[in-house]
């Protein structure tokens, strides 16, 4: 399904292998760079896969030989899979390119999405992503991860929002290289089902906040 506004095309790709999604990202990126296509966002789920960003250390990886795909985004290792909504914004950033400001816009968009579901989430100084603050249930917990790259002024990679995924997949790795915090999902925090299908229209409604600022 494709939704287009005057500024942004949103492509719902269903479930897509990581390599196929990466190929589509690169195709869209080239089209945006060469002005053949306007800003676009891919929204999808992946089959279970681990991906390692450029700052991943050997000890962050699974110890049991689980396959890992090395990618050219920032950040460290993470997991993608069923029950997690992944977004790949392919956006031309205004000059001068401010990567930190873009990451903050992505974070705020996801914070606003969480708020619509009734979950209070925010930022932690020095750490990217969106977090549920420490409370009597435990330390701070990441509900959404962000890892991006900017090439020729246009973004690649993006964000992942844990909806109702199996959180035990994170037990094999040091997610995003952070040992002193946890990982969570909308469903785990709210105590009710929140599926990718539930999250899709909410995320889609907030995506225009990423464009043109």
From Swiss-Prot:
Superkingdom per UniProt: Bacteria
Catalytic activity from the UniProt record: octanoyl-[ACP] + L-lysyl-[protein] = N(6)-octanoyl-L-lysyl-[protein] + holo-[ACP] + H(+)
Domain spans labelled BPL/LPL catalytic: 35-213
GO CC aspect terms: cytoplasm
Name by which UniProt lists this protein: Octanoyltransferase
Pathway(s) where this gene product acts: Protein modification; protein lipoylation via endogenous pathway; protein N(6)-(lipoyl)lysine from octanoyl-[acyl-carrier-protein]: step 1/2
PANTHER family named in the record: LIPOYLTRANSFERASE 2, MITOCHONDRIAL-RELATED, OCTANOYLTRANSFERASE
Localization per Swiss-Prot or TrEMBL: Cytoplasm
Additional note from the record: In the reaction, the free carboxyl group of octanoic acid is attached via an amide linkage to the epsilon-amino group of a specific lysine residue of lipoyl domains of lipoate-dependent enzymes.
Known role: Catalyzes the transfer of endogenously produced octanoic acid from octanoyl-acyl-carrier-protein onto the lipoyl domains of lipoate-dependent enzymes. Lipoyl-ACP can also act as a substrate although octanoyl-ACP is likely to be the physiological substrate.
Catalytic residues identified in the record: 176
InterPro entries, per the entry: aa-tRNA-synth_II/BPL/LPL (IPR045864), BPL_LPL_catalytic (IPR004143), Octanoyltransferase (IPR000544), Octanoyltransferase_CS (IPR020605)
Residues noted as binding substrate in the record, renumbered to the chain: 73-80, 145-147, 158-160
